[in-house]
Amino acid sequence: MLDSNGSNTTAAAGVALLAKAKSLAGKKAIVLAGTGPVGMRAAAMLHIEGAEVAITSRSKQLADAASKAINDRFGFAPTPIEAFDNEARAAAVKGAQVVFAAGVIGVTLLDEKDWQNDPTIELVADCNAQPPLGIGGIEAIDKAKERHGKIAIGALGLGGLKLKLHRACVGQLFESADQVLDAENIYAQAKALA
């Protein structure tokens, strides 16, 4: 089971809950801080659901490198966007229906004012459980909770599925010693459990 620092199970749980809440096919999805392990996997899983995906980074170079790495591993290249600050990230989410925040602890990637009245945003998910959260205006415990007319999922809201998924995958490994569970397999399992 490949799950470095929980990156596959975290991304899988978040995207599976988004997909359960609403179809992602044809939606524009932005992964904020999409150059880390959770963000890159979330981008791939959003793509599996048929979303048009972009990833942001503070650095265009890092965004380009992550897009290439995602393409090398998953066979599609998300649009790389440099979004150095909150203003640039607010501009990046304009026109998106899905926002997935995968940033580090203690960094707000998107202020509440930048998404609460946006007419196109339908779904927001945040993997950061420690305040300040990655997306302002949602709570870590949100699990498909309506906020400002949008569906919000917080880190603890997806955490239950993440732990259930992790246990199920580890249990599956005891059934046969010759299997490999990577991002795609783990995501399929997350969808079944969501």
Show where each model-derived region lies.
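General beta-strand structural signal in soluble alpha/beta enzymes
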Residues: 1-4, 31, 125-127
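Glycine/serine-rich phosphate-binding loop and adjoining beta1-alpha1 elements at the start
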Residues: 1-25, 153-159
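Short glycine/serine/threonine-rich phosphate/pyrophosphate-binding segments
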Residues: 11, 36-42, 63-64, 107-110, ...
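Glycine-rich phosphate/diphosphate-binding loop of Rossmann-like nucleotide-binding domains
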Residues: 21-98
